[in-house]
Amino acid sequence: MIKSTTNPQEQRLPRPEDQSPAPPPPPPSSATTSTAAPATPTHQVATVIANMDTLKTAFLPNLSMDPNVHVSPHYCPMCHQQFERPQHVADHMQLCHGITLNAQGAIATLDGGHPQAQQHPKLSHPCFNCDEKFGNAVDLDEHHRLAHQTPAFLSRCLMCSIYGIHSATQQPNEYKCTQCGSICTTAMLAAGQQGFMEQQEAAVTPDDQLPAMAPRDMRLTPEEQHHQQQLQAEHHHQQQHQQQQQQQQQQQELLEQQQREMQEQAQQQQVHHHQQDQDLAGDQVALKVPPLTVKLNKNANGGAIVSHPQVIIKEEPLSLSDSGDVVNSVPVYAIQANPGVPAPASSGVLVGTQTVPADLAHKIRHKCPDCPKTFKTPGTLAMHRKIHTGEADATPKERPYTCSYCGKSFTQSNTLKQHTRIHTGEKPFRCGYCGRAFTVKDYLNKHLTTHTGEKPFHCGYCEKSFSVKDYLTKHIRTHTGEKPYTCPYCDKRFTQRSALTVHTTKLHPL
């Protein structure tokens, strides 16, 4: 039964007229509580409050303990919290401590003299950081401040669930990558975090995202922020490793594809040459020697003299082509009768030790060693080679393709296309080993031999080998003494065109 009247057992709150505005009395010490009567619920609450104040002093050393600051005449006897009005004290004690005050401002007691406390208050304020629940916001705030706002060395990492003491033992300015073992500085942490956040915004799958941030993440301590940056930077670094591995795999596949294409091209050329040799061997016919005419001349005595025409055999370097493709030059022997006896229109020619049918004679071409052009007669080839040696310039008819950037003319449209890439900067042929790009595919094939080490072109005079056929051609000239490039001013000859250019620039400037 609750007693509402004042009696000696009632514990009254101090009033303004009964006390001076001195600071509230401190809670009873441990020595006092040890010698006092059996602890009542009020004394137990006071003991808990005393321990809480000890925690405050330990974890918040900068908290002002001056009792003269913000002293109010109305305070809670349980926790010494100050209020402006007595009604606020009553509401506070009922909500926070479960103690009810009567109309006279005294603590309502039971028959046994113990203060009345609310049994089983409604726990409507859960903690977001643990499973605890509280009956009011004040207790929840006190719990959060003491239990979850402890120093950093006791806090729990929100990212990896490891207590923060592990971050204090590590180097604050560096972290080690688990993929490559490299150590990054704090300057790289900021860059890693920025790149990680950009990837998080562009990510479309939840697997690539970090765990969702809890409400308390907005109030991270500096140690927690530093540790979070480390994890984010490490995650970004691992993604960079994956991208690099994918790029290396793509480059390796590109290299393998280029090597397969080169091997297939070489095999096709070998098959083509072998098939051509078989066709020539299978279609050979007997050599048709021009018919010899016998002319009877009478001498002075009236006798007859038989006159035989003289057959002349001369050797010329020619090249054969069955389908318009130029092949390597082979020795071709052209049989020509004496000019006194005209040869028939259809005649055979001897190729090495074989004969070539007459219907293939018109396909015999003379290939220029400096460019892909071919000619029907050696004389036409000789006139054409003067263009390369500088003895004569090509006529406008021979250079119908003009560059729109510089006005330079070319004999072939493909050559103009390659030249135009010099002005546009286009290099569509890229090396898969080093990334170097070229304007012409032949240049790329020559460059690839520097990586593979392949030297398929061997010199017949010495043991040297070359990766490019042009290099072999220039080298052979050192053995044969051939100098196809002649200076148009002093008739001096050179083995290479570059040497002629240097000579003309220095000794014969325009």
Swiss-Prot record:
One GO CC annotation, please? cytosol
> Compositionally biased, Basic and acidic residues: which spans?
222-237
- Pfam families xrefs: zf-C2H2 (PF00096)
Q: In which tissues is it expressed?
A: Isoform I is found in embryos, pupae and adult somatic tissue; isoform II occurs in embryos, pupae, ovaries, testis and to a lesser extent in adult somatic tissue.
C2H2-type zinc finger segments: 74-97, 125-148, 366-388, 401-423, 429-451, 457-479, 485-508
Q: Which InterPro entries match?
A: C2H2-ZF_Transcription_Reg, Znf_C2H2_sf, Znf_C2H2_type
GO molecular function annotations of the record:
DNA-binding transcription activator activity, RNA polymerase II-specific; DNA-binding transcription factor activity; DNA-binding transcription factor activity, RNA polymerase II-specific; RNA polymerase II cis-regulatory region sequence-specific DNA binding; sequence-specific DNA binding; zinc ion binding
SUPFAM superfamilies named among the record's database cross-references: beta-beta-alpha zinc fingers
Function statement: Transcriptional regulator; binds to the promoter region of Cp15. Also binds to its own promoter, thus having a probable autoregulatory role.
Q: Would you tell me the protein name for this molecule? A: Chorion transcription factor Cf2
Q: Which organism is it from?
A: Drosophila melanogaster
